[in-house]
Amino acid sequence: MFFSLAFALFGFQGQITPKLPVRAQAVSGFQKPQRSKQNPNSVWFLPRVSNRSANTKGKVFVIMYHHIREGANPMFRSASKFRQDLENLYNAGFRPVTVTEYVENRMILGPGASPVVITFDDAHPNQFQLRKDGSIDPHTAVGIWSEFSKTHPDFPVKGTWYMLPVMWGQKALREKKVKMILEMGSELGNHTYNHKFLSKQNDEVVKSEIAKMNDLLVKYGIPANMPLCPPYGEYPKNKSLVKSFSWKGKTYNHSSACLAWDAPALSPEDSKFNKYKFERLHGNSYSMGIDYWLARLKAGKVKPYVSP
């Protein structure tokens, strides 16, 4: 559902409903989104990103990364190639949103922008590390992305990080790192406790795997109704468990669940969209990875979601 606002070019301050996507156009060039001091709920003014026609039924790129490191492995993406991915996405008109913003159809985008949902699985240390001086390791995913955002402020570190108990290592710094990444605009999600194939487990094991990780993340201030990512994209036999269940006298709910396949996802406005079963594509150069899909996009063989 889209919410159209008529407003004067300068100074309009209208109340918005948080769950409705809101778009406004700046006068020219990039203008960092700001809220009025007098009215903190005012409309955000965002620049036009491209002259493409609106297409709110188009495909959404939900990209899945694991390791930021060198190596011939589909789960690896080198630091230089990840940096190039960000550049390619930016130049193609993509701007980042979280999984929750996507599935709830409340993506705040400038006109002509396409949403990209950047996700990271497994919480590997090469995704986010702090150095002894407290600075972010520039060779990690967060380091590369945050550096990119300095010259591209409309492409902030806003993604979804599906966590395992390792939580990027550096246990003594865990709380600090969670706070930092949330302040950047990202969110954390549940990738289960032991990364098991849920399709091979009975209901009790599935509940335990999901609940234990949920409980751990809640201790760090993550909302209990968080996104879920079943390991390997394998759903439990009882698929209702990815939505909600009761375990040891407590009820658990998740706001979404994703697959781990090789194609762009449906728009949240598509009648077939299911927020508990949306697709992702690999952040790699292998068959059906991000390089493949960006090439198809350039060739006009895939029609992306474009904000009005």
Give, region by region, the residue ranges found by the protein language model.
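Short amphipathic alpha-helical segments and helix-helix/interface helices
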Residues: R83-L86, V142-K150, E175-L182, V242-K248, ...
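Generic enzyme active-site microenvironment
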Residues: T119, Y162, G189
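A short alpha/beta connector and helix-capping loop motif
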Residues: Q129-K150, K158-W161
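C-terminal active-site subregion of NodB/CE4 polysaccharide deacetylases
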Residues: K19-T119, P125-K132, I136, K200-P308
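Substrate-binding clefts and substrate-entry loops adjacent to catalytic sites
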Residues: G189-K200
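Short, conserved secondary-structure transition motifs
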Residues: P165-G169, E234-P236
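Sec-dependent N-terminal signal peptides
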Residues: M1-I16
